[in-house]
């Protein structure tokens, strides 16, 4: 009996953590930029796993990103896809776009996800205006918590910025 219970616990733990494809599009809406009133911290990545060659995936939302063009009043700032394990505790991925200067990127932030019946999202994305000396002059921010349904495209609105996110099982 103890062996059966142990094997059930191990299989439950294995099921509790599953691999997902996460795809994010961060874009600017036609509105005037709204300052966050603060600059991103130097530790903006907060020990999150970076999205790099080891976990990046081919984006699938290219048609949706294509509709977010200047003639429609939008500008895509970041479009990335990656593989991420989701379980009972939140796991964070660090995303960025543009050239790094003094530890910061023009677009940088974290996407935190927690699995379960619904997927819990904690987004903290900074869109930085970097001056000619390489320092951040001002920033916009998307900091929101949401609940996502697996496989569904979700829109996160934040005034002058928006984000589309889809989390699908692999």
Which ranges hold each PLM region?
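Sec-dependent N-terminal signal peptides
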Residues: 1-5
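N-terminal signal peptide c-region/cleavage motif recognized by signal peptidases
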Residues: 9-13
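Extended, low-hydrophobicity segments enriched in charged/polar residues
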Residues: 16-147, 154
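Soluble periplasmic/extracytoplasmic beta-strand elements of cell-envelope proteins
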Residues: 23-25, 164-168
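Pocket-edge structural micro-motifs
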Residues: 144, 157, 169
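Short, exposed beta-strand-loop hairpins at the edges of beta-sheets
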Residues: 152-158, 164-166
């Amino acid at each position: 009996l103890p062996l059966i219970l142990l094997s059930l616990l191990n299989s439950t733990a294995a099921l509790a953590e599953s691999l997902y494809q996460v795809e994010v599009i961060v874009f600017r809406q036609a509105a005037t930029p709204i300052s966050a009133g603060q600059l991103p911290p130097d530790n903006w990545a907060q020990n999150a796993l970076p999205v790099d060659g080891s976990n990046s995936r081919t984006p699938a939302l290219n048609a949706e990103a294509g509709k977010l063009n200047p003639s429609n009043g939008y500008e895509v700032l970041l479009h990335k896809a990656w593989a991420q394990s989701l379980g009972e505790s939140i796991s964070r991925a660090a995303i960025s776009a543009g050239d790094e200067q003094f530890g910061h990127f023009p677009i940088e932030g974290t996407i935190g996800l927690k699995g379960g019946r619904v997927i819990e999202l904690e987004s903290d994305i900074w869109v930085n205006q970097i001056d000619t000396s390489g320092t951040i002059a001002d920033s916009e921010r998307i900091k929101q918590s949401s609940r996502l349904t697996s496989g569904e495209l979700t829109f996160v609105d934040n005034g002058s910025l928006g984000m589309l996110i889809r989390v699908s099982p692999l």
